[in-house]
Amino acid sequence: MKVVAVNAGFNVTLQMAYPPNDLLVELHNGLNTYGINWWHYFVPSLVNDDTPAGKLFASTLSKLSYYPRSGAHLDSHQSCSCSIGGTVDTELKVIGVENVRVTDLSAAPHPPGGNTWCTAAMIGARATDLILGKPLVANLPPEDVPVFTTS
C-alpha cells in the first residue's frame, strides 16, 4: 500500500497505533539489559530492582500487557445446541423428525478446544458422506481405502 501511495506522489509514513514506538524501544532496551530474566519484571516485587532502569522496564511491560489483558477477548462461537445423542443421532438426523439433519457446529457433542472452523468443516464433510450414503473409511475393506501416493 505504501508503494502505491509513494508511486502516486504521496509521502506516507506508516506507524502502528499500538504499541507506540517509544514502548517498543524501551522493551528492546530492557530485553538487552535483563536477558533471560526479563520476564521477572512482569512482577516487580520478584526482582526488587529500584533502579530507574528497572522501574522503567517494569512499567513498560505493564503498559504493553495492558491491551491484551483488557481488550483482547475470545469470540463467542455458539455450538453444541443440538449435540449428538441429545438432539441428533449418530447419522446427524434430528431425533423424532423425518428428513432433517443438523450439519453444522451445533451438532458437536462439546465445544472444540481450538478453532471452531475445523470441527464445523468435519461435521459438514461427514454429513455429506452420510447423505450420499458413503461408508466410514474405517468400515471399508483395506483394498477400498483410497491411498494417495507421490511419485
UniProtKB/Swiss-Prot annotation:
Protein's UniProt keywords contain RNA-binding: no
Q: Where in the cell is it found?
A: Virion
Q: Which GO terms describe its molecular function?
A: flavin adenine dinucleotide binding; oxidoreductase activity, acting on CH-OH group of donors
In the record, the note on similarity to other proteins reads: Belongs to the GMC oxidoreductase family.
| Entry keyword annotation includes Nucleotide-binding | no
Any single Pfam family the record assigns to this protein = GMC_oxred_C
- Quote the cellular component terms of the Gene Ontology held in the record: virion component
Superkingdom of this protein's organism: Viruses
Name of the protein this chain belongs to: Putative truncated GMC-type inactive oxidoreductase L893
Q: What is the lineage of its organism?
A: Viruses, Varidnaviria, Bamfordvirae, Nucleocytoviricota, Megaviricetes
Q: Which PANTHER family does the record match to this protein?
A: CHOLINE DEHYDROGENASE, MITOCHONDRIAL, GLUCOSE-METHANOL-CHOLINE GMC OXIDOREDUCTASE
Task: Give UniProt keywords alphabetically.
Answer: Virion
Q: What is its main location?
A: virion
